[in-house]
Amino acid sequence: MSGPEVELVLGKIFERAIETKKRVGQIYRQFARLFSHVPEVEDFWRKMNINQNTHADWLKETKESLSEEQMLSLPEVELVLKMHSIKNLFDKHSKKEIGNLHDAYEVAHELEFSEVNDLFKILTSQFVSCEKKKNLILSEIDEHRKQIKNLPEKFESEMKEIKVEGG
């Protein structure tokens, strides 16, 4: 199989989802560097980066458990549409300048509550066979989102005052 059809197989969707989680992790790692002068904030972003890499590992394990027939099967249209939305989301955020913690929070909030985690949830729900592991992964996503939502409360009025290092 060659050409555009290759992009439409389930295996490619998994590969892109893995790349997406790693890319989000890189964004969070960059945030940790930008806020390295505020240890609590740096630690928050460092942990978020680790979580994203764990998600990528889970997706990789799930992909490796699929049969060749599954890997070459056509994915649901919803998965393909989510991949296109994710590309647009990254294009949008690649141009955004981060000047303070509030800017970083806005990017992270949009990523965590976007197609990035929607796609992760769908792939987990449909292809992780162990119910215990599936529930763990899905609860991890919810916990991750809660951590992002609670960031403004944690730093209250400091969100715009905590500038990037050198900013």
Residue ranges of each PLM-predicted region?
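Non-heme di-metal
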Residues: 1-167
